[in-house]
A protein has these predicted regions:
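A short, N-terminal "cap"/entry segment at the start of jelly-roll beta-barrel domains
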Residues: 1-30, 112-129
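Conserved short histidine dyad/triad with adjacent acidic residue
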Residues: 18-21, 32-49, 84
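Conserved strand-loop elements at the edges of beta-sheets that form or border functional pockets
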Residues: 24, 48, 56, 76, ...
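Short, conserved beta-strand element in jelly-roll/cupin
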Residues: 35-39, 48-65, 103-106
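A short hydrophobic beta-strand segment most commonly corresponding to one strand
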Residues: 81, 95-115
Length: 129
């Protein structure tokens, strides 16, 4: 099926973010994969996934943070593996575009991403480790 590129919803993202669906698995697969492009400074809100999430940096420079851990920088080829139900955010560096392939699964009960508050400028602006 054709899945067009769309703007990410502002309730769950800060800044301009475009989502380009790559894969929605057919049962029994619950895999979803989306290319996500963030403009400089754009990022997700805090969120978590019931089965975790894997991010593969494709281009530009990005950031990712799991709650309670330092901000990490992502460059093309880098992979971030987010554990199940770990609150986290990810997005572009302040002065760079960033695209990653985001891969996750829904839980067996069908539940997916749980969204929380937007990431503060203070949390976002922390120097990467």
């Amino acid at each position: 099926a054709d899945r067009p590129t769309k703007a990410a919803p502002p309730d769950n993202f800060t800044g301009h973010v475009m989502q380009d669906p790559v894969l929605v698995g057919e049962a029994p697969s619950r895999m979803r994969a989306t290319n996500v492009t963030f403009t400089p400074g754009a990022r997700t809100a805090w969120h978590q996934h019931p089965v975790g999430q894997t991010l593969l940096a494709v281009s530009g420079v990005g950031r990712v943070q799991v709650e309670g851990e330092p901000v990490q920088e992502l460059r093309p080829g880098d992979t971030a593996i987010i554990p199940p139900n770990a609150r986290h955010w990810h997005g572009a560096a302040p002065d760079r575009l960033f695209t990653h392939l985001a891969m996750s699964e829904t839980a067996e009960d069908g539940s997916g991403t749980e969204w929380f508050e937007h990431v503060s400028d203070g949390d976002y602006g922390a120097e990467p480790a």
